[in-house]
Amino acid sequence: MERQKKKDMDFLTEDLWEIILARLPLKSIITTPKLVCKVWKSIIESRCFRDLFQSLHQNSHHSSWSLMCRGCETEIMSHYGSDNWNLNHSLGYYISSFLTDKFENYNEARVVSYTDVGLILVHRVSSQSFYVANPVSRQCVEILPSQKLDCFWILGIATRVENGVVLGYKVVLLKPNFTFLIYSSETGLWSLNSDTFPFSYISQEFNNPISLNGSLYWLAHGSEYQDFIVSIDFYVVDSRSDRCRATPFPDLDKVPKFRRTCTTSQGCLMYMNIFSIPKVDGNLEDKLCVWRLESWQWRLVFEISLDSIKTGFDYIPLGTDPFDAKTVYLWSRKCLLSINLHNGDIVLHKDVEHSSAGRILNSVDCPRDMTYILESNFASFVLPQWMHPFPSTVRSV
């Protein structure tokens, strides 16, 4: 019987295998072929197969994503199910499972950087090694430490992406003398690189960098309460370009309700905050303002009144939907809430919600302590629409 099945499989042409495999969830496509045969592996790594898969799944929901609390792998909220990956659990579950299975001592390894292309950067304290991994597919490579690793800040991982495929990545560390120690997947080597910062500063925050489009972004503080977003493009090809930039926040003439932080949406850097604006009658009105960074200038894209939220000032902005810039999320003492910035609709969410299409929104693990949330840093972790085996010049583990 088994021999007959194998003969039947041998009669299937490569075109037929493409059609069969393209109807599977992305998680199955990535994890199964490497266990079966080289032919399947060759099929799924082709551009034609990727185009076929995306055309068959074009009506699926956006990829799964989660808002993670940095430093502790706590999942603030998650969206998953009924997409290309067809996951049964949230991304936080897969991260926790991956770390538990990968490391004997769970506490010795921590996630230090999240991306919007399905990769996380893990630091193993005992050996000073780094691991670049996709916790869902379990693809993982180990990056051995450089001999120059004495004292450094971990900035994160910058990625080079083309047509949705990760072609390369760089692990970026910053030494106290503001020299970068960079590991490149294309060379398999660590190298030192220095840059000139285009502004004077009092302090910089290296605990919450954002990885986006080959660049890393983080917050810096100048004199007279001037806050900046610092960005460095680690894949700039024009040597004449200023790869290091400092962009002042757009609301320096106002007093924001919350400390300044950024999120990402649809491939852009986003900033939102809440301000008390005087009304005509002299009373104050809370307004949520959202800006998008375009050509190194902040553009106000949404401004909406929050007077309709009748809970007092009892909510904290969390971030923007990675796939929908007009949807933002806030946390109150009772629950997660979302606001549609286009029409002003406000939705109070349950801890777990199931849509009719099978999509799941989960915020059950979010800490209920408002002070904890207020003082935490958050990062979006997003799975891509397609996951090609990511490049590596070091051994897979």
UniProtKB/Swiss-Prot annotation:
Matching InterPro entries: At3g26010-like_b-prop, F-box-like_dom_sf, F-box_dom, SCF_F-box_component
All residue ranges annotated as the F-box domain in the record: 6-56
PANTHER family (alphabetical): BNACNNG10540D PROTEIN (PTHR31672)
Name recorded for this polypeptide: F-box protein At3g28330
Organism the protein comes from: Arabidopsis thaliana
